Amino acid sequence: MSDKDTQPLTGKDLARKPRGFPDKREGLIHAQAKLVETVTGVYRKWGFEALETGAFEYADALGKFLPDDDRPNAGVFAIQDDDEQWMSLRYDLTAPLARFIAEAGQTVGRPFRRYAAGPVWRNEKPGPGRFREFWQCDADTVGAPGFHADAEMIAMGAEALRAVGMETGEFVIRVNTRRLLNGVLESVGAASADTRLAILRALDKLDRLGASGVADLLGKGRLDDSGDFTKGAGLGDAEVKAVLAFAEAGAKTRAETLANLSKAAGNSEEGKAGLAELEAIAVALEALGAPEGDVVIDPSVVRGLEYYTGPVYEAELLREVTGEDGKTYRIGSIGGGGRYDDLVARFTGETVPATGFSVGISRLASALAIMGETVKLDGPVVVLNLDKDSPAVALEIATMLRRAGLRAEAYMGGSGMKGQMKYADRRGAPAVVMVGSNEIEAGTVTIKDLEMGAMKAKAIQSNEEYREARPGQIEVPRDQMVEAVRRIVEAQG
């Protein structure tokens, strides 16, 4: 380490944020809040109730594993309390729910249907689109053993995505079950945990590497374009063929996929039980009116199968976007969930059936922004301070607007007319209210509709014509100001 690295930071160098903890401006904050409002509105419509837990949980209560994390307890932020117990920031909204259910016991009626929204934290290496702090919005049913509860989660998740603006064909929820895959692994003789994990990792790369690349990873191994060699799962040719037949059994309809799976899943009892799970879910999805295009049965979905105990589902955006490099790519996963019947057993020894669905709010907000689906911000009406001898008048006008329920502010800077207009434009103001000495004397105000003014200004050829026309600008008595401004705001809304 150099002397420079050990020197204390001073001045501007001190102004830095920790890696993976993004600052958010109003646009993104507003978009996230709108998504939370919309998604939780769907959850409430389906009969779920709100539950809020603290940001910290005792580290030993969180458990020794994370979803999709190969390093137990590697992904949390922890501090030691003054009683020497370790507390961790929650890494998801499910582990606190499990603790709540175990602690509340029978005082919580079952089935217990709850939703929650809030930030979670992961102590992982940050990167593009990968943060250490992000928002999730979950719904869970605790105490419902039937697979109709899983189907409900899936159908409700699809409705939530449609509610935020996704159309059929722009997203898909893929469904699989752990027991079905276990049956396939059993039929090909994958007994050891290492072999099973290698197979899961290989199948997870099917979209990226295709059948040929996955076949290499299921067999002896794969040499990539950079020359790096990845050791394979060590399956023989017949076993590789069987696993690929299972992973590629997806078809146009859920019924066709199930028919293909009945042939590819093998003869193990575990595989048959998994197939029965998916058949029950498919029947329930039909009853719930979940469109075929929104929800598919996809045996290649393996992410999370080591965490969940039964069905697993992954929500993915299908719309392609163009990156800064000019290449097109899919945004990918924006949510998912599954059945986790063992989570509460860590506390009580009792197997409590539970299933849930989570929408990644931060990821979805970023995805919608990339796709150009921005939320229009309602900027404040700005009251310009044009009479330096009577600065309190602008305060009085802004107060009148706010008391009428309109969002408004008086300009507090030191700029002149041009600078104040630029400020109002930057704030996204629908209108400005101007009160100079002439208006004060006449008991009037001048109101400029910034949106209409900009539209009309495009047709004006000269500065002289612009000054004469004053596009989008009206003068009204002060007692008519509120209604005049309200009409402008509502017309733009």
Predicted regions and their residues:
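Glycine-rich, mobile lid/loop segments that gate access to catalytic sites or pores
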Residues: 172-186
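Acidic, His- and aromatic-enriched active-site or binding-groove loops in soluble protein domains
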Residues: 71-83, 189-219, 317-321
